[in-house]
């Protein structure tokens, strides 16, 4: 499955547009990890735990979007966009949404 942020695929012709597809992932924050991240914010440095969670959420959202496209018979998803939103009381959750247009490519 080809996933691209562009609206065309170089060297390939889009035969049919199948519809908009989405994938979402919501991850909750861990209290201990939050505390360690706050300490890192004060002393500087990157939060590896948060980066890993963000990467996992992004990969999950993209995989769900690709699966939705497969169910429509798509060969690719063009115009892929990723959105990030903080949710929950105390902003304790992160939602990652992937969206794009499922397409069938000409042979």
From Swiss-Prot:
Gene3D superfamilies: Hypothetical protein apc22750. Chain B. InterPro entries: UPF0145_dom_sf (IPR035439), UPF0145_YbjQ-like (IPR002765). It holds the Pfam family YbjQ_1. It comes from the Bacteria. Belongs to the UPF0145 family. This is UPF0145 protein TTHA1256. It comes from Thermus thermophilus (strain ATCC 27634 / DSM 579 / HB8).
